[in-house]
Regions:
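Small-residue-biased structural context
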Residues: 1-208
Length: 208
């Protein structure tokens, strides 16, 4: 955490305090999934985070088009990054749902299916790299929108757009954390127990 805070210019004490405050407000956000099965965690990711990302990207797209009709370099750049984020995420979610998750569930059920990707570490590394790209895009969008804060006198559409982007970012943080630091390590550990030569997983921290 110290390195991440230093890189973002945030005092660690403030970050810890904010986390503790959020835990008091909504403890369900911080449920410990480490003891759950891959099947239960994957189901949660699909029905909660994957569904939310798709719904919000579709909902925010027309708002983005409406808001960026007004000539403004930063808003135009924001639209470019949002379009890239949407394309990137939709492809990423499909890859997970059609390839990665089915393999993980089959492996947990006692199988080690034949694959075109070798060890599960290979698609997981790809997923983590794509998660990093999501983080970079969201950071850039936050910079372009003054931390998703609409200026005084901004229209209602712009306020709704920025609020939606902030909410999307918050959900993506939890989404990517659960995959990078719970689902993927559990999957690699399970595969390692079945195929001992597979490497142990590292821990990843997405910086938004």
């Amino acid at each position: 955490m110290g390195e991440a805070c230093a890189g973002a210019g945030c005092p660690p004490g403030e970050v810890v305090g904010a986390i503790q405050e959020l835990r008091l407000k909504d403890v369900t956000v911080y449920r410990d999934w480490t003891g759950d099965s891959l099947a239960d965690l994957a189901a949660h990711l699909l029905t909660t985070h994957h569904a939310h990302a798709r719904t919000e990207l579709e909902r925010l797209a027309p708002l983005m088009e409406q808001v960026t009709q007004v000539p403004n370099p930063e808003l135009s750049d924001l639209r470019v990054h949002f379009t890239e984020l949407r394309s990137h995420l939709e492809s990423h979610l499909m890859h997970e749902e059609q390839i990665v998750f089915p393999y993980l569930l089959a492996m947990e059920a006692g199988e080690v299916p034949a694959t075109c990707f070798g060890t599960v570490a290979n698609p997981i590394r790809t997923m983590q790299e794509e998660h990093d790209q999501v983080g970079r895009l969201m950071r850039r969008m936050r910079d372009l929108s003054s931390d998703f804060t609409a200026p005084e006198g901004a229209c209602e559409s712009r306020r709704r757009l920025f609020k939606g982007l902030a909410d999307l970012e918050a959900d993506l943080r939890q989404h990517l954390h659960l995959e990078n630091n719970v689902l993927f390590p559990k999957a690699e550990a399970l595969e390692h127990s079945k195929i001992p030569e597979c490497a142990s997983p590292p821990c990843f921290l997405i910086e938004f």
